[in-house]
Amino acid sequence: MNIVLSGKREICGNILSAVLGENGVKRLYFGEYFRGEPFAEIEAVKEPSVLVETWDLSGIERILEVNGVFLREFMSIYKDTVVYLIESPEENYLCLKGRIIPHYWSPRDNIDEIAREGRFRGEVVDNSTFLVFYENRFFAVKCNQSINIDVKDSEVEFSAENMSKDFVLVASGGVSKEAVLREVSSAVKNPLKIAGLRAKWLKSLLSKIPSLQTKRKDFIDLWKYCWYVILTNRSVVENHPILVKPFNMPTKYVFRHQWLWDSAFHAIVLSLYDVNLAKEELYNLFHSQKPDGRIPHEIFLSKTICRRLWRVDDYCPWTTQPPVIAVAVKRILDKEFDRGFAKLAYEKLVKYDEWFSLERDVDRDNLASYIDYLESGWDNSVRWDDPIARLREQPDYYHRLYPRARMAPVEAVDLNCLLYVQRKTISELAEALGDYETSEKYYALAEETRKKILQYMWDEETDFFYDVYEDTHEKIMVKTPAAFLTMFAKIATREQAEKLVEHLFDPKEFWTTFPLPTVSADNPKYDPRGYWRGRSWINMVWFTYWGLVNYGYLNEARKLALKVIELMARGPTCSENYDSSTGEPVGAEDFGWSTLILDIMRDLEKEQL
């Protein structure tokens, strides 16, 4: 099996990834440890012209015209080694420059401070090789000709003058100085070996993907591409105290660590490929669980980055994320019941649910609250505008309820639908494991949560579910796709589901070019390119699709799915999100949870896709 694309400029290995620009390697990342910006920039009098551009399983090949000279450019990555080649039929007298710096989270970060905290240092090995060190990681860069190397306190700059006709630049990262130096020495002598190893690795992975029964070539191309994304986002981080098992990064080009709800979605997709990989995806999350029961929002590769971003001396922040993990556990165990995994998941989910009851339910009504917009997963959503404003108006009042709150506590409709599913799942696991008392307890708790959602969150006038403030149960009248999780969780009544379907297919609300914008299109704050303020995300499509199926709206589910699949198949693309008014892919490339479309395609296949 092969995948051939035109115009794709991103390529990744294990925790190493790179992105081509118009004139060389625009960005290179080694996890959350190092970045090259640029890594290899061709200096030319005029901007290079890209004449031909082909991406396949072996790497990326381009033909460039630079200062009247035609160059063949090739880049490949295998594991944590990258090779970059430039071939010229004649002397070109071109120069190339690059630099390596410690990784930062925001362009506003102080690189000098980060370098000091992570003990960054550079070292010249010889006239063609240098090494950098940061947070117990090494990264070596080597060329097949002499280069100028300038070691500074927080970066290493390098340049190659009068590049040879067969120019080779390689780099490799790892935990051993000797190993990375051996790797670059080997790769610079035989760079095409890296391309061969990469192609062999990817062909092996893709040979095991399930087949898709459809006559649509563009659908098959999307199917293969999304499998490429979910399988190559898998990562192994050596010598990490929490990331002890392989896991999927959401994307290796932006979000290079593990997130809670992302990994739950990844596990759901991986269960279609290999149930053991799906279980493995959740192990680090279980391992990261804190003594009080909280499963953290995210697990950083770099403690320095987490400390600077969250002001905690840890690899994890103090927040959680939407509890989709029980949904993933149920999907895995429905595929294959593993008693050992079921017992582990049961114990972890019970502790996690107890944490929600103790730490996110101050009014003890069996509805939990978000107290930080980032732990909602909907970062800058219109949903949180008023709650953030309320906290600013009454900080003392809200901080008495929750000292770390960054918005007025919100009993969110999606959070509590997921908690309902989690409590039902715990009840089912307890019964399967013979703990009937706990099973009855969590069944009753789930029922209380369901009743309160129906009592407080449904609005008769607008026929829609809304978030409510925890202290007053006043509705926050912002329509979002979170309401459709009441159908996913089977909480909505038949009559309510009918009304929700009307909202879904209203072009003024959620039936936009790319369906399900993160706020209804009739909201004054709707922005079709706004991150969580109007873009469309595939996880919301997935929840809504299965909600429609749950209530027997099979034609409507198919209509939703096909509209989304058609747009994604145009590339194919598997982007972080999409402009809801045009369908244009936006956000990060090769985004993990957007492969949830595979789960939908697999279900649609039963009816002839």
Predicted regions located by residue number:
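Beta-sheet entry/capping signal
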Residues: D166-V168, L277, G293-R294, L485
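Short acidic alpha-helix initiation/capping motifs at coil-to-helix transition points
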Residues: K200-S207, Q258-W259, A444, V478, ...
